[in-house]
Amino acid sequence: MIMETDVKNSRYYLNRELSWLQFNKRVLQEAVDTSNPLLEKLKFLAITSSNLDEFFMIRVAGLKHQKENGVKRRDIANMTPTEQLENISDACQKLVAQQYMHLKGILKELETEGLVFIKPVDADERQKQWMGNYFEREIFPVVTPMAVDSSHPFPFLASKSLNIAMLLEKNERDEEMDEENDIDVKTAIVPVPSVLPRIIRLPDVSEANSRHCFVFLEDMLMFYAARFFVGYDLLEARAFRITRDADLYIDEEDAQDLVVEVERQLKKRQRGQAVRLEFEVGTSRFMRRFMTQEMNLEKEDMYQIDGPLDMTVFFGFCGIKGYNHLRYPEAHPHSPWSMLDLKRTPETNIFDMIREKDLLIHLPYESFDESVVNFLYSAANDKDVLAIKQTLYRVSSSSPVVQALEKAVQNGKQVTVLMEVKARFDEANNILMARRLEKAGAHVIYGLVGLKTHSKCTLVIRREKDGIRRYVHVATGNYNASTAKLYTDLGILTCNDRFGIDASAFFNLLSGYSDPPIWDSFIVAPINLRQRCIELIDREIHFAKNGEDAHMIAKMNSLLDKGIIEKLYEASQAGVKIELIVRGICVLIPGIPGISDNITVRSIVGRFLEHSRIFWFRNGGREELYISSADWMPRNLNDRVELMVPIEDPEIKRRLKQMVDIELSDNQKAHIMQADGTWLKTISAENQLCAQEYFQKIAEKRDAEDEMTLAQKLEPYTPVLGHGDGSD
């Protein structure tokens, strides 16, 4: 008999950081997936690098602080900060080596398409002449070489900046010094200007030539380095890159003005402690020792790079004109299915549609502009709308959402916005947007002390013939027009009275001193979301112990909360079938005999970033479905304001169940977690089904067809969920 306390044993949990690195490895695998176009494979390398940058700036930096402060506390997997850092370094060294091995293969493939990266020394005479002129005209005036000696201390180098370290010696040395073997070696740093293009296209031999050559800016700088140090011989020149701690340390309790304090901390971000040094392969021991000593780094913080440093440079290159055949076909968001059959006359507005039925929006396949932005602009311009209230966590830099809110203020609406200024790496943009809204005349609040407001909710108050009506939008993803084209998310537009009453109470809780109400539909963190999730799992345990069919499915970005995982293990032991779809971190281990036999975990990594959270519980045949802004992580359940809402509309429940069904049937982009914590990608040659492609095809083809009829015309999939027994 398995003791309940067994589920607390650390051997049943993975380390958070190593689990995240496994996720980034899954992203890296897309760079060698032959189903992806060539430039998209290159983009996945850039994504992997961007992910690693943030990982070091936040997660590794935090662990280094713990180590320096003597913290010995063990994590969920029984690892100390020091042990975690050692394991992270080993895993990252292997991951980076794989990255650059894959890059070499992709660059060779690009050569067959006529896109060739060369070193300046390998350029022909015509190209070298052009490079020399370009260097003198465009580069030399901008670059500032900096000596490093007793009168020139090692310069401050910004996080993620690219630099060149150089060793020099006088080309006319003192003979006595030569006799004594005391060569006077100088060191210098040349920052690679970020204001100049990093990838430089060389002129083609002719217009008809199909071979296009490119060089990296740092290679050109090193090729012409002698121009900066007249009278010196160049002994060595190597590119290197520093990553610094970028977390913000904000004391909200003592801060008199939160926005001012965030701005103050943002100024410190670029000057954080160095946490990683990347340098070119072939860098001498003397140069490595020189750089690590100056930046107070250890051996485990050093990464030797066999290729161009910072692959995020390829984000821009992947958009090169004239090579559409090397990219995904352009994906255009389509009209939301829920709205198609409601567009009857030009006079029909979105409020008419919502009154007729709840609307489901499935991003990025369905249009954010036609749904959410339309909803906000309609509210801004509608003479009967009295007020708009909205939470904003991340918005795009030229946000149509903010523009709609500004328009609403101009039209005399009461506009209240909770702008979360602590959204990591979006702090500056959010502060800018908040000040724009304040200047327009909106009421802007900045959340609750000690909590990030991560929920996605909009409330529109409208006067109608039969009285005041509340229109509500709740979603799993941000009000960000840019990421709405890249992330898979779900949103609901409704005028359900229970949602409306709860939404009013929710905004009162955020803006004033109101005590939490007794919620009718909303489930709110950190108030009762954790408790409700535990209750829902307990209910399935009850059914299983009574011999009934017990089944639950949860889709999220990350699974980290130990309390939730212990409950999932308990449910598995009781016989509950548990299917988890987790894109990123998952410290739960499935398939452990006697502990998690009934749990499976899959992760879908593809063209779009899986971001929606869906929770399905069989509930003895009376199925319940929820969507949420929250993952099952301590920060979401304890330290953030989050929302989870039940899905009540039968049509939306049916559609959501079909979505989950298809994702559980994906056999092209799904990775299955094994009982040893590793992941295995599933690729089937028969009955191929890629969930993201499937949803895209439906969005493209269903304008005049019933969705279920259309589904029969697409690739078949095997249903996983039972759709009978009172499923609606």
Predicted feature locations:
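Hydrophobic alpha/beta core scaffold segments
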Residues: 577-581
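Glycine/threonine-rich ATP-lid/beta-loop region of ATP-binding domains
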Residues: 562-565, 569
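N-terminal localization/anchoring segments of enzymes in phospholipid and broader phosphate metabolism
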Residues: 1-552, 570-574, 586-728
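Cofactor-pocket helix-loop regions in the catalytic cores of large enzyme subunits
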Residues: 557
